[in-house]
Curated annotation (Swiss-Prot):
Organism: Bordetella petrii (strain ATCC BAA-461 / DSM 12804 / CCUG 43448)
Similarity comment: family membership: Belongs to the RecA family.
Identification of the protein by name: Protein RecA
Binding site residues for ATP: G74, P75, E76, S77, S78, G79, K80, T81
InterPro entries according to UniProt: AAA+_ATPase, DNA_recomb/repair_RecA, DNA_recomb/repair_RecA_CS, P-loop_NTPase, RecA-like_C, RecA-like_N, RecA_ATP-bd, RecA_C_sf
Family annotation (Pfam families): RecA, RecA_C
Amino acid sequence: MNDKSSKAAASEKAKALAAALSQIEKQFGKGSIMRYGDNEVEHDIQVVSTGSLGLDIALGVGGLPRGRVIEIYGPESSGKTTLTLQVIAEMQKIGGTCAFVDAEHALDVQYAAKLGVNLTDLLISQPDTGEQALEITDALVRSGSVDLIVIDSVAALVPKAEIEGEMGDSLPGLQARLMSQALRKLTATIKRTNCMVIFINQIRMKIGVMFGNPETTTGGNALKFYSSVRLDIRRIGSIKKGEEVVGNETRVKVVKNKVSPPFKQAEFDIMYGAGISREGEIIDLGVQAGVVDKSGAWYSYSGTRIGQGKDNVREYLKEHPELAVEIENKVRENQGIVSRAATFPASEAEAEDDGQA
């Protein structure tokens, strides 16, 4: 008897739940609530490469996650904008639409083109106020047709009241409130439309800090909480060719990561006018993973010598990009992360459609 009554109660509960789910879907639309075990739910995180193999590995999932808020911060001239332009180039390669909200009014389009950004398809906005920048971002996210938005930078998102006020006016907390309100509004839409939003941020010093780290980022604490990934990028040295400085040695630390264990770091070279030296990373990480063999100054792959000295091998891989991708994907496989060709599920279907057409 007890068994029958418990079954009946369970059946009633199941019916009540089904009715509630149906009502929610009717009111808020299909997909507003679902069982995690259902096929419609995506278990795998869609990612986009950062343009750096080492950083993709450090992130643990093979790149930056889509449908999330990302914060990239660091001192001046550390490579923040370069890194975001590389991400834009990678997103465009796989068919994504990208927007650059240039609040600093300092985007160098020639440099962006050198990094592989397709300027013809890039959406660029240079807003007058912080409110305007965030309203434009909100409109682009809600459209559902933009895959990546970069905001450069949080420090330049000046509230309208500050612009219209006098130079010496004290308006404490205004920018922090603006960011907090915008992120509350944006987060749910970002997830639903699978759009990645990257905020570039600057570093400030906290006055009077005796112990601990005196560094902080601008725009209050909201961005720290809403970000799924926070990257701290620093210049750690210079790359010289003779006496001439031709690039920077850069270190990126994954300070926060909601999609994989945090606190990993990656080091790579940023060459002036060329961006992240991907080939250099492929060589170093290929040797570490045992994919590329190094004997003295000679480097070999699959029993074939590919060059003597790192610079020669780098040039060889630039001339043979298909070999570079092959080695990179073997390194990714070795690390258990998604290969470059598979970072965007829609691209395969699009490729098939192109083939049929």
